[in-house]
């Protein structure tokens, strides 16, 4: 079995996350795999070696949701550090967060997304969102 380099890493794991907007709603995915299985967040994932951040953002949204996007701008970043009971760094992520408009495609769950959903502001409080997703959504639509 291959070791997951994101578990007890020797350096932070770089990723992207994308707030995709369409008609006043944002696209969220319910994670299908640990460590966030069942939790809602923006689509996103890892940046490959030699891959530009914006290219990784477009690829991850396409893989997880089937939606093609036009990136508007970088809007935030998130630093996630999880320590185990002994204080060792179990996971360390640095996510660059983009805002984008949906330009084509029908939302469908793919890759590690268990479900996708277009969500209006009135629904945010009812969903089990990651802390950073909730914080970014609380700032409102950045477009």
Label each region the model flagged.
Residues 20, 28, 100-102, 118:
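Conserved hydrophobic "DFG−1" position in protein kinase catalytic cores
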Residues 68-77:
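A short coil-to-beta-strand element that immediately follows conserved catalytic motifs
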Residues 25-63, 67:
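Conserved Nudix-box catalytic region and its N-terminal flanking loop in Nudix hydrolases
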Residues 18, 74, 98-100:
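A structural signal for short, well-ordered beta-strand segments
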Residues 99, 108-139:
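NUDIX/MutT-family hydrolases
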Residues 78-106:
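Active-site-adjacent beta-strand/loop module that shapes the phosphate/pyrophosphate-binding cleft
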Residues 1-17, 88:
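Acidic, metal-coordinating catalytic segment for phosphate/diphosphate chemistry
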């Amino acid at each position: 079995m291959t070791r997951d380099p994101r578990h007890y890493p020797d350096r932070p794991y770089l990723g992207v996350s994308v707030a995709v907007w369409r008609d006043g709603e944002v696209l969220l995915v319910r994670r299908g795999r640990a460590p966030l299985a069942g939790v809602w967040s923006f689509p996103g994932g890892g940046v490959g070696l030699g891959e530009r951040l914006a290219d990784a953002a477009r690829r991850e949204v396409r893989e997880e949701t089937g939606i093609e996007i036009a990136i508007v701008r970088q809007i935030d970043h998130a630093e996630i550090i999880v320590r185990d009971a002994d204080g060792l760094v179990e996971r360390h992520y640095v996510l660059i967060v983009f805002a984008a408009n949906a330009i084509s495609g029908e939302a469908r769950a793919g890759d590690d997304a268990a479900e996708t959903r277009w969500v209006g502001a009135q629904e945010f409080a009812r969903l089990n969102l990651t802390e950073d997703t909730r914080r970014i959504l609380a700032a409102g639509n950045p477009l």
